[in-house]
Structure formats: structure tokens, C-alpha cells
């Protein structure tokens, strides 16, 4: 029984280590240089209003995508509502009747 438990602990440790190597683990910080180690990434809210009226999904963007964006459309009451939030390499172009707001820091399109 102890051998099985030890094997599971070793397996979990190996799996967590390999997840960090491929970028699936949490961000690692070099304390001496005070900067992130590995491929740079940012986090943006990523959701579609049709699927989720409240946007609570905040996810890690693909490496190289440093722009968070929110697309707005008129709501019929004289105002506008967001319809899509996500990340991209560059700020997307607004379509007819749309407005796009882009920002360039982590979690900046949350509201």
C-alpha cells in the first residue's frame, strides 16, 4: 500500500513538472530579476454575450496575443452593450454598427 501511494505521489510530481515545461502550469517568476520566466502571456476576459450574459471567464491568451478587446453594439435603448470579449495579436477592426475598445494590460477588458 505504501508503495502504491509513493508511486502516485511521484507520478503527480512528474506530471506537474511537465505541465510547467509546456506552459500549462502557473507563471514562474525569477525573484532575482523580478520578471516572468518562459513565454510571455496575458490574461483577458473571453466570452460571447449570446452564450453568457455575465462575463466571468478570464483565460490565458495564446502566446503572442497581448491585446484584450471588447466589441460593443447598440442595444436599442440609446446605449450600447458588449457582445464579445477576447484576446488578439492586434486590435480587431469594428464591423458596421460596432465599436471596438482595445487595451494592453492583463485583465483590462474585465468591465
UniProtKB/Swiss-Prot annotation:
What start and end residues bound the annotated signal peptide?
1-19
Subcellular locations according to the entry: Secreted
Here the disulfide bonds are 44-68, 47-55, 61-87, 91-102, 103-108
Task: Answer whether the UniProt record assigns the keyword Disulfide bond to this protein.
Answer: yes
Residues with the modification Pyrrolidone carboxylic acid, per the entry, are: 35
**Tissues/organs with expression:** Expressed by the venom gland.
Q: Name one GO molecular function term.
A: acetylcholine receptor inhibitor activity
Presence of keyword Disulfide bond: yes
A Gene Ontology CC term for this entry? extracellular region
UniProt keywords, alphabetically:
Acetylcholine receptor inhibiting toxin, Disulfide bond, Ion channel impairing toxin, Neurotoxin, Postsynaptic neurotoxin, Pyrrolidone carboxylic acid, Secreted, Signal, Toxin
InterPro entries the UniProt entry points to = Snake_3FTx, Snake_toxin-like_sf, Snake_toxin_con_site, Toxin_cobra-type
The record places propeptide residues at 20-34
The UniProt family comment states: Belongs to the three-finger toxin family. Ancestral subfamily. Boigatoxin sub-subfamily.
Q: What does this protein do?
A: Potent postsynaptic neurotoxin. Displays readily reversible competitive antagonism at the nicotinic acetylcholine receptor (nAChR).
> What is the name of this protein?
Toxin 3FTx-Tri2
Q: Which organism is it from?
A: Trimorphodon biscutatus
Could you read off the lineage of the organism from its UniProt record? Eukaryota, Metazoa, Chordata, Craniata, Vertebrata
